[in-house]
Amino acid sequence: MNELANRSFSKMNGIGNEIVVLDLRDHPVAVSAADARAIASEVPYDQLMVLQPPRTPGTEAFVRIYNNDGSESSACGNGMRCVARQVFATSASDALTFETRAGLLNCWRPAPNLYTVDMGPPKLGWKDIPLAEEFRDTRSIELQIGPIDAPVLHTPSVVSMGNPHAIFWVDDVNAHDLARFGPLLENHPIFPERANITLAQIVDRDHIVIRTWERGVGLTKACGSAACATAVAAARLRRVNRVVHITLPGGELGIEWRASDDHVLMTGPAAFEFEGRFDPAVFAAAAS
């Protein structure tokens, strides 16, 4: 029998981003890509956040992040807020530190049911994002969808928040068929690790509206790292201030690109939905 059978989990969401939190700190179990896909077939999610025993002193857990297609990600802002909510529920600490593939993330609770995650500094160099070819200025790269003389989407900004993001600037985020263009752009050869694709509409210097096609997931109500990447990209273009609020289909996030250390801070809520246990039959079916 699969060791995950009958394990308890928490179903949560971060402004509509569907999250499953699986705490394996006390009973470590290896989670495979096939396991992640099997779990998604039972409990539909955007990201699976797996808490494993800490690898670094002073941290609460090493968090592995899976997309619902079984691929792994290094960052998920909404998922980390859900993880923070769950761990804060049994912790007397005012701040928590977690480790992911992208490094250490500090989390704190500025108000009831509001959680801030320090997502660290953005990566802006073309090799670090990464891109398949050199671009000296990642504020705007040569990439478009549609006819050469009348492209539908063009010249995105690119940023990594531990995962690659391409942000296309538009007048209306709802005027484009992101479900159609998203998978084409996600898998474009310029992105060797694929990319999250965001449409961004700047309302004023303090407000941006976005929609995101999430790598390994598809259309999503919210993507926290996309909100962070968009805020950074817009500030680099001098179109917004370093503190902005981002409107996503699922709700609102506050983003600050802190000038003192270049770190990006994301603040928003996390909602608990229910607890459950995995059905052993799900893993048996996946293994057959």
Curated annotation (Swiss-Prot):
Pfam families (alphabetical): DAP_epimerase (PF01678)
UniProt subcellular location: Cytoplasm
Pathway membership, UniProt: Amino-acid biosynthesis; L-lysine biosynthesis via DAP pathway; DL-2,6-diaminopimelate from LL-2,6-diaminopimelate: step 1/1
Assigned EC number: 5.1.1.7
Alphabetical list of SUPFAM superfamilies matching this protein: Diaminopimelate epimerase-like
GO cellular component: cytosol
Signal sequence segment: none
Reactions accelerated catalytically: (2S,6S)-2,6-diaminopimelate = meso-2,6-diaminopimelate
Site, Could be important to modulate the pK values of the two catalytic cysteine residues: residue positions: 165, 214
Major localization class: cytoplasm
Swiss-Prot/TrEMBL keywords: Amino-acid biosynthesis, Cytoplasm, Isomerase, Lysine biosynthesis
Family named by the database record: Belongs to the diaminopimelate epimerase family.
PANTHER family, per database record: DIAMINOPIMELATE EPIMERASE, DIAMINOPIMELATE EPIMERASE, CHLOROPLASTIC
HAMAP family: DAP_epimerase
Role description: Catalyzes the stereoinversion of LL-2,6-diaminopimelate (L,L-DAP) to meso-diaminopimelate (meso-DAP), a precursor of L-lysine and an essential component of the bacterial peptidoglycan.
Record protein name field: Diaminopimelate epimerase
